[in-house]
Amino acid sequence: MLLSLVKFGILSVFLLAQEAVAIQLWNNTDGFSDDVPAAGRSALTFDVKCANYLVTARDVANGAALVGNLESHYCTEECHDSIDNFQRSSHLAYGTKAYALFKNSTARVVPGDIVNGLMWAYELSCIKDSTGYCLAGIYNHTKTACSECTLKYGAVMASSGYGRKQFPPNVFSSLLSSCNVPASSYTYVYTSSNPTTTPESSGVPSSATATPTSTCTGKTYIAKEDDTCKSISEAQSISTDRLVEVNHLDYSCSSLTSGTALCIEKNCTVYTVQAN
């Protein structure tokens, strides 16, 4: 499957009916440094009206997917519009200027990037096809590489700096080509954001955990129709064991399909043991 690059964990908490509540990333501005303009601080304590949690860019990058009725409670027009308003007010207050946002920290961040991450995480979490929400199915390998869900996922990943490291635009283009789907069917607008600015905690139900994502440090290869683990290993100079381990394939390689995005790293000289 396409996401054999990464091992994901699925949020599997089921909540009873919830009303949208106001959530703030920061309850007050006491922790902000003096570098942050007083006039714009209120923008960062914006009341976001979603369920009783926010899904951050870090959550989805670490493999979090909403399941059960969490999806329908979070993926609402009210939540989307509230995050959108938060995004607009933050951009209006701070633009693209970076600040030393927190006391006792010299790291300079663009406040708007944090909110961009919330909108990107919303769009990723709320991808749907005719059968329902997609993200959990993509993560647990029940959606095929050329499915509507996976192609929508690719477009959202390529649309932001938060997703491009795991799913670069050239990989998405190769996937569309291998699926014989025109790029015009899955267009996206790129929003440049610095992934280091995403909040570490979002308030997503704490009893659900996500498996940390392992990032590919090499290159990405798109499997072709006649590829096997052996042929890829030889052509890309990676041991078969390493190929299987990094991409979470089964050792018989039966899960390898055309269009699968594979991480190729720690190259070596491959030698196939001959008889005698």
Swiss-Prot record:
Gene Ontology MF terms: chitin binding
Intracellular or extracellular location(s): Secreted
Gene Ontology, cellular component aspect: extracellular region
Job of this protein: Secreted LysM effector that might have a role in sequestration of chitin oligosaccharides (breakdown products of fungal cell walls that are released during invasion and act as triggers of host immunity) to dampen host defense.
Protein family (similarity comment): Belongs to the secreted LysM effector family.
Other known facts: In plants, chitin acts as a microbe-associated molecular pattern (MAMP) that is recognized by lysin motif (LysM)-containing plant cell surface-localized pattern recognition receptors (PRRs) that activate a plethora of downstream immune responses.
This protein's name: Secreted LysM effector LysM10
Gene: LysM10
